[in-house]
């Protein structure tokens, strides 16, 4: 069923992490690579019906920069990379889609490339020509840039990671759920967390 304008649906799934790791490792993939590939595979099979497409399926994936730059900051410290699959032939297996996703992510998730992305982002913030521009104009410009970048990607998948809590709180918590706000042009999104 189609939802009314201005509303969105949320679907939650829960699975044992140990079993997911076993399946992902069976494909020689990390959990992130596996989830992104499953999402791309689903779009390829269900929306494109396994046919070649003119546009790539592009998934925005946030990358935590802390391990690459030895940082303990509690602020958001990440950049976005885009895992890309471009269906050009009649039929792909899941393994072929996964290999494309892994290649795409591996080519971008390395210290040199992440440093370039981070430096570009910081240079925009420190641009002396932008300092006298009123904040409301900067906010409008940022909204336009954000919307254009969101439309450039089919969807976004983020992995919050393993959520740890103090032992004294564990009896009161059954699990965690998370979701990402909707973006123009991205009507499906995924959030992963483990507990």
What are these regions (language model features)?
Residues 9-23, 44-195:
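Acyl-thioester-dependent acyl-group transfer interface
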Residues 28-29:
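A short glycine-centered flexible hinge/capping loop motif at secondary-structure junctions
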Residues 1-9:
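Short amphipathic alpha-helices and their capping loops
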Residues 32:
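Glycine-rich acyl-CoA binding loop
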């Amino acid at each position: 069923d189609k939802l009314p304008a201005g509303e969105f649906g949320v679907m939650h799934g829960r699975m044992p992490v140990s079993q997911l790791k076993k399946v992902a490792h069976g494909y020689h993939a990390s959990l992130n690579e596996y989830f992104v590939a499953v999402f791309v595979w689903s779009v390829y099979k269900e929306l494109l019906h396994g046919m070649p497409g003119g546009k790539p399926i592009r998934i925005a994936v946030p990358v935590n920069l802390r391990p690459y730059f030895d940082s303990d900051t509690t602020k958001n410290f990440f950049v976005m990379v885009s895992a890309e699959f471009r269906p050009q032939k009649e039929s792909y297996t899941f393994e072929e889609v996964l290999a494309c996703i892994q290649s795409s992510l591996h080519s971008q998730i390395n210290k040199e490339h992440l440093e370039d992305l981070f430096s570009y982002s910081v240079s925009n913030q420190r641009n002396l020509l932008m300092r006298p521009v009123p904040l409301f104009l900067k906010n409008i410009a940022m909204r336009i840039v954000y919307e254009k970048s969101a439309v450039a990607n089919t969807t976004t998948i983020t992995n919050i990671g393993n959520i740890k809590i103090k032992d004294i709180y564990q009896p009161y918590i059954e699990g965690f759920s998370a979701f990402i706000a909707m973006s123009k042009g991205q009507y499906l999104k995924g959030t992963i967390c483990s507990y």
